């Protein structure tokens, strides 16, 4: 079962993950965090989130590996929004079949807008989450 306003933040930068969690918590979301893809798969097994905010470069299991494994196990059970500093963020998001992307650095209100747009929907959406 998908928890509608539950966001899973998959980010190895602890400070950034804490900041995103604080912003989303203040906006009324339930936030769980994982520092790599393997930990994220464990969080998903506990409870399917309404949205996965996914960093691409992480130790242990990176974003590509996580997305591939998540989709093999769960299909499109929760939307994935790629969060990356890569210039080709949209291409990277499309490569893994993500529902959107958010480019680093981002404005804090953009995180809330993306969560509002995608959390709880659980279905594929438009590729451009930057202007939610």
Regions found by a protein language model. Give the residues of each.
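Acidic, metal-coordinating helix/loop segments flanking the phosphotransfer/catalytic sites
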Residues: 33-51
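Receiver (REC) domain active-site loop signature in two-component systems and cognate sites
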Residues: 58
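Non-catalytic signal-transmission and effector/linker regions of two-component phosphorelay proteins
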Residues: 1-8, 109-132
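Active-site residues of response regulator receiver
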Residues: 55
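Conserved acidic carboxylate
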Residues: 11, 84
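Alpha4 helix (beta4-alpha4-beta5 surface) of REC/receiver domains from two-component response regulators
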Residues: 65, 86-102, 113, 117
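Acidic catalytic/metal-coordinating carboxylates
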Residues: 36-39, 62-66
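Charged docking surfaces used in two-component/phosphorelay signaling
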Residues: 18-26
